[in-house]
Amino acid sequence: MSSYRQTLFILIILIVIILFVNEGQGAPHHDKRHTACVLKIFKALNVMCNHEGDADVLRRTASDCCRESCSLTEMLASCTLTSSEESTRDI
């Protein structure tokens, strides 16, 4: 009976370890893709805005556009916003 409990205990530990390993591998891959997307869109926005846009606003816009699609008009509108206007626009 004790070897049965020992085997069951080891099996449960292995299942828990496998579940944690699989859970941990999913998130970083998405974060890497999202970060790469934000960087590409931020660079494109910076060029489209002739390097005159507020960097925080452009970075936030890039992040939003990576999460859900946004139009070119929305992207270009971020060129003229400042950080304070962006925070009041969200309210």
Swiss-Prot record:
Its main location: secreted. GO terms for biological process: innate immune response. GO terms for cellular component: extracellular region. Keywords: Cleavage on pair of basic residues, Disulfide bond, Secreted, Signal. The keyword Repeat does not apply. Residues 1-26 form the signal peptide. It is found in: Secreted. Disulfide bonds join C37-C66, C49-C79, C65-C70. Belongs to the insulin family. This is Probable insulin-like peptide gamma-type 1.
